[in-house]
């Protein structure tokens, strides 16, 4: 962040020069500075934040993690990054860990073998980001590991991540004040006292100051109480208050994050303001989501401070079904255009019952063959088995693909809003057998 750091120095020098050289000289120097700054050869590449997974149930989330930086890299005039740090997880006895995702990150090309409480960890996925300031390329990395079993086994207590070493890259990044490293565990837990919630987890490694906007769709907000959003972000500086977090167009804040200083080295879970060059922030968004909303938009912006967003998670009390279908055991007989098959309609990843009489339409290619309906209410996590005999028209070839679509009235439209609208289909290849002619 030497560009930001140098901007601060420059402004300070302008104040001093004003005492001796006058306002006209200031204007000329500032114009020259802006001109040179705009001509700087700069480009950036990263991996945009996108939906990783959606989890539905009586769930909530929290973070545990820590920075490797012993001080903020800007304006500290020395290297600040260690290779180990610890944090404490403290869930209640009624909280049951459902998911635990470890993210670690730092400056440079990447350290993809670290230790967590003495267990060697290698990533399931990796992310990268780079910025080019002529003549150097500044790289950054993040890694992801599903450590659900480890956290379920360990439970509450101290978690220590070690052997995260970015020392080979620290001299280069020190020149721009972007030398950092840190880690965080995103924990999704179940508690029977919670309402049915929808958790959306997004990740990548996307640089801000470009505005990062996430549009949440397929919602049906039944209750806006305790709605919240959180994120894991890297490389923020508390001394550069130029960032905002908005929900549905409204700038929001919390006791740890002023409206104009979102990325300020804070941890909303512990209340610490010494999470240097890293943010684990959680915001209540109750007042910005309305009952009955079917969509929402959140956005993060930074106008000067260089930030990387690694993870965004939202929790909303959105209650909708999620119909899926699977076909099994298709049987045919020789010289017949009838097919008998079993099917199962499920409502597993949902927060509401699936009503009876949900339509199921069968297609041969693009031609509608038949429509049937579920018989009973399917509870959350439940399923219903069915059987049907289809008569295939003579216009359909002997070899074709049979497609089943649940929540389809026969013209490609459904009768309900679902949590996920693109998982309603299942297809299998069918061969009709005809006796050879002699």
Regions picked out by a protein language model, each given a short descriptive name:
Residues 318-438:
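Extracellular/luminal regions of secreted and cell-surface proteins that mediate adhesion/ECM remodeling
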Residues 1-47:
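Bacterial Sec-dependent N-terminal signal peptides
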Residues 45-333, 340, 344, 359, ...:
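Disulfide-rich extracellular domains of secreted proteins
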Residues 21, 45, 156, 248, ...:
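Feature targets compositionally biased, intrinsically disordered low-complexity regions
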């Amino acid at each position: 962040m030497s560009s930001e750091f140098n901007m601060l120095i420059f402004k300070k020098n302008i104040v001093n020069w004003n005492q001796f050289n006058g306002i006209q000289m200031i204007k000329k120097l500032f114009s020259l500075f802006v001109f040179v700054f705009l001509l700087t050869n700069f480009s950036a590449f990263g991996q945009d934040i996108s939906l990783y997974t959606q989890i539905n149930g009586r769930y909530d989330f929290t973070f545990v993690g820590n920075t490797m930086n012993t001080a903020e890299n800007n304006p500290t005039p020395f290297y600040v990054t260690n290779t180990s740090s610890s944090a404490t997880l403290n869930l209640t006895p009624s909280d049951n860990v459902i998911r635990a995702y470890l993210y670690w990150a730092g400056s440079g090309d990447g350290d993809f073998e670290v230790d967590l409480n003495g267990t060697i960890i290698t990533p399931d996925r990796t992310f990268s980001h780079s910025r080019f300031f002529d003549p150097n390329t500044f790289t950054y990395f993040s890694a992801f590991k599903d450590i659900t079993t480890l956290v379920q086994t360990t439970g509450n207590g101290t978690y220590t991540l070690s052997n995260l070493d970015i020392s080979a890259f620290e001299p280069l990044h020190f020149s721009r004040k972007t030398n950092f490293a840190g880690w965080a565990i995103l924990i999704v837990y179940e508690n029977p006292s919670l309402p049915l919630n929808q958790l959306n987890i997004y990740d990548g490694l996307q640089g801000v100051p470009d505005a990062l906007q996430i549009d949440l769709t397929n919602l049906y907000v039944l209750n806006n109480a305790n709605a919240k959003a959180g994120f894991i972000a890297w490389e923020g500086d508390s001394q550069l208050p130029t960032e905002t977090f908005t929900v549905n167009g409204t700038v929001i804040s919390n006791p740890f994050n002023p409206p104009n200083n979102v990325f300020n080295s804070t941890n909303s879970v512990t209340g610490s303001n010494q999470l240097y060059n890293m943010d684990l922030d959680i915001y209540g968004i109750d007042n910005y989501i309305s009952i009955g909303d079917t969509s929402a938009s959140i956005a993060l912006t930074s106008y000067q401070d260089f930030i990387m967003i690694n993870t965004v998670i939202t929790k909303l009390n959105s209650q909708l079904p999620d119909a899926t279908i699977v076909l099994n055991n298709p049987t045919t007989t020789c010289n017949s255009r009838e097919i008998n098959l079993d099917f199962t309609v499920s409502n597993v990843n949902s927060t509401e019952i699936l009503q009876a009489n949900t339509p199921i339409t069968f297609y041969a290619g693009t031609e509608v063959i038949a429509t049937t309906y579920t018989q009973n209410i399917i509870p959350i996590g439940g399923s219903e088995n069915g059987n049907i005999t289809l008569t295939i028209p003579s216009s359909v070839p002997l070899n074709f693909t049979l497609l089943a679509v649940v929540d389809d009235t026969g013209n490609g439209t459904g009768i309900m809003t679902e949590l996920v609208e693109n998982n309603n289909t299942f297809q299998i290849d069918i061969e009709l057998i005809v006796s050879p002619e002699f």
